Amino acid sequence: MGFKKIGVACGVNPLPGLKIKAWLIATGSDLDMEVEVVESAQEMPLEPPTPRIALGDRKIAAFLAASELQKAGCEAVIIPDVRTEPFLPELQKELQVPVISLLAGLPESLKAEGIRRIGLLGRAVPQDFYEKIFGADFEFVKLAEDLTPIYDILQSPGEALKKHGFSPENEEMMMKAGEKLLEAGAEVLIPNCTQMARFAEELRLRGLPVIDLLRNAAVEAVKATPKRLPKPFKVGLIGGLGPAATVDLYDKIVKATPAKTDQEHIKVVVEQNPQIPDRTAALLRGGVDPTLAMFNCAKRLEDDECDAIIVPCNTAHAFLPYLQRFIRTPFINMQQAALDEIKAKLGDKARIGLLATTGTVQTGIYSDKAKAMGLAMFVPDAEHQERVMAAIYGPKGAKAGYTDGVCREDLLSAAEVLVRDGCNCLILGCTELPLILDESDDFEVAGAHMVVIDPTAALARKVVKTAEEAFERTGIH
């Protein structure tokens, strides 16, 4: 015996939802398959003040219900609402769980039966929507003007069908409408109102050739459950360390993305927390440990279903091993991205000079990786390391808003020392340093020509490459 788990957004339209539930179970029984039906009770707000707000209510309620059912592990979802049909593509774009249309498979099956002329029983959705779905092989019978008041009564919110069900008065009105459509040449009738769809069985017993949309969707969901769709790549960014570095990384991701439209850019979620304790202070002076604050950010990004997490702070990477013991989402490592680019540019001939905070230097987050890759790495002597720190933290440094003058002189003096050590490459290993020196493939220092790598830019390029690889696999931005 097989098994299927199907979700129904019953709260959007409770009674039609129950009918779909019954059809799902019955179809499973016919196919010797156990069907677990999961219901969402998400309702639409009452009494929207305008038609546009009513449409927004319907879209958002359908999305909330489908999202809930997706999280519950459903293999497919049915929204028991004819008015939802026109925006199912919008809904599906935001979800991975397949949303089964009430009209699923109908154009093909009706064409196979030789049926060409269709009448719409109700007017919840404009006729041109159906004409687009069914195509040129079908002709829809024009709505007779005298049916409009009948449909208005039957579809009245809180009255008629919704309130009184298949009463003699409602039966008479539906039969009259159906017979009019048949007289006009319709071969079959499609309920263009969810409440009318609810009574398809009763109308068929009275001789009207009404297609049972609720049964149709249930059968399609069980017999031909589509595969869950891949989701677009989404990167999570632990922001706030520092705020300007967060903006810088995001800006570099945008600039590195080869997009021609807004829609081709990468989904980015920023968990901005400037209150994360200072990483350098924690490493060098016994300051407050930032591990929990960083973990909380990473967990939120993981819960938001990010595919990768990035951190726009070199020193913060020293704390990632603690997070990675609990966070399943992979981190794209800034130092590794920078070193991979250097290896690609210079190979084993690379002699790397590291310009970074003393905390970053002491943690070995660069040197340990460089050693594992067989790359030589050097740092300034103590005197010039102090000048690097002054370029970052000093009263005329980058964190104080300066990008030229004393801070640049301090940084270049440290770079000159590294040139004397034979370095042919510099890593700007603090997010403030690219504000002072630009990334370059040919930067002259003390008569030597060097490659200068901005790890933030390298990380941005790695994010874009990872996103492009995901797009090649899924075809989804």
Residue ranges and their predicted role:
Residues 1-477:
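Non-catalytic structural scaffold of enzyme domains
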